[in-house]
Amino acid sequence: MTSILGDDSGSRLYWEFLDTGLAESAGMGSYDHLGCGGIMTYLCCSPENAQANMERLKALQQKIFDEGVTQKELDLAKRKIASRIVLASERTNTRMFSIGSQWLSGQKFKTVAQIAEIYESMTLAQVNEAIKAFPLDNSMTVVVGPKNDLQAV
């Protein structure tokens, strides 16, 4: 989901904010832990664009909740993720970290191919169900910068 919505290239945040020049950077990432986790969305822009961009982000989150993501977006995300997994597995420290993490969390060891297959097996319905189960507008907003008059959206 975060690859579709907030990846650094080709995501919805990219097209909404970076490609248009409304922000210097924007992205979304997931932080998963055993049994819990979170999603962080960040947006870096000029103070003059801050309020309008927060409103654009809110509208984008609502559109994602209402309409879900498309099969084309999911297919692209699967290819990106599989490529990242394979490329990262070429580094020894990444392979060792993966083995250690799986062992510490009590999981059976999975090969790179097995991990990639988990992502490949995700369906559009599953992704859209996750979006409904964990709405992006259920969040806290933190603002860093010179603006002290921003209104919550």
Feature roles, as predicted:
Residues 22-24, 136:
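A broad structural signal for short, well-ordered beta-strand segments within beta-sheet-rich domains
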Residues 1-12, 21, 143:
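His/Glu-based metal-binding/catalytic segments typifying zinc-dependent metallopeptidases
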Residues 78, 82-153:
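C-terminal regions of mature proteins
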